[in-house]
Amino acid sequence: MEQAPEDQGPQRKPHNEWTLELLEELKNEAVRHFPRIWLHGLGQHIYETYGDTWAGVEAIIRILQQLLFIHFQNWVST
């Protein structure tokens, strides 16, 4: 009978800790490429829409990833 493999890898960080670290890295990168007033407005919109929730954190991560991807894609192709 098949058995699930035992967990032999290193312990992973908790999801919420990893998510907050990712958000911090994305914010630091976004500040280097976009005006702070835009980013502040985006943060305000997310907060007004989602409040102080994990859904808001996930939304801002998704939007920052998309913005940075498009920014770099356009920058490299021109």
Curated annotation (Swiss-Prot):
Matches recorded under InterPro entries: RetroV_VpR/X
Post-translational modification: Phosphorylated on several residues by host. These phosphorylations regulate VPR activity for the nuclear import of the HIV-1 pre-integration complex.
UniProtKB keywords: Activator, AIDS, Apoptosis, Cell cycle, Host G2/M cell cycle arrest by virus, Host nucleus, Host-virus interaction, Ion channel, Ion transport, Modulation of host cell cycle by virus, Phosphoprotein, Transcription, Transcription regulation, Transport, Viral penetration into host nucleus, Virion, Virus entry into host cell
Gene Ontology cellular-component annotations: host cell; host cell nucleus; host extracellular space; virion component
Region: Homooligomerization, residue numbers: 1-42
Biological process according to GO: DNA-templated transcription; monoatomic ion transmembrane transport; protein homooligomerization; regulation of DNA-templated transcription; symbiont entry into host cell; symbiont-mediated activation of host apoptosis; symbiont-mediated arrest of host cell cycle during G2/M transition; viral penetration into host nucleus
Domain of life: Viruses
Pfam family, one: VPR
Localization, UniProt: Virion; Host nucleus; Host extracellular space
Family: Belongs to the HIV-1 VPR protein family.
SUBUNIT field: Homooligomer, may form homodimer. Interacts with p6-gag region of the Pr55 Gag precursor protein through a (Leu-X-X)4 motif near the C-terminus of the P6gag protein. Interacts with host UNG. May interact with host RAD23A/HHR23A. Interacts with host VPRBP/DCAF1, leading to hijack the CUL4A-RBX1-DDB1-DCAF1/VPRBP complex, mediating ubiquitination of host proteins such as TERT and ZGPAT and arrest of the cell cycle in G2 phase.
Record function comment: During virus replication, may deplete host UNG protein, and incude G2-M cell cycle arrest. Acts by targeting specific host proteins for degradation by the 26S proteasome, through association with the cellular CUL4A-DDB1 E3 ligase complex by direct interaction with host VPRPB/DCAF-1. Cell cycle arrest reportedly occurs within hours of infection and is not blocked by antiviral agents, suggesting that it is initiated by the VPR carried into the virion. Additionally, VPR induces apoptosis in a cell cycle dependent manner suggesting that these two effects are mechanistically linked.
Additional remark text: HIV-1 lineages are divided in three main groups, M (for Major), O (for Outlier), and N (for New, or Non-M, Non-O). The vast majority of strains found worldwide belong to the group M. Group O seems to be endemic to and largely confined to Cameroon and neighboring countries in West Central Africa, where these viruses represent a small minority of HIV-1 strains. The group N is represented by a limited number of isolates from Cameroonian persons. The group M is further subdivided in 9 clades or subtypes (A to D, F to H, J and K).
Name of the featured protein: Protein Vpr
Lineage summary: Viruses, Riboviria, Pararnavirae, Artverviricota, Revtraviricetes
Gene transcribed to yield this protein: vpr
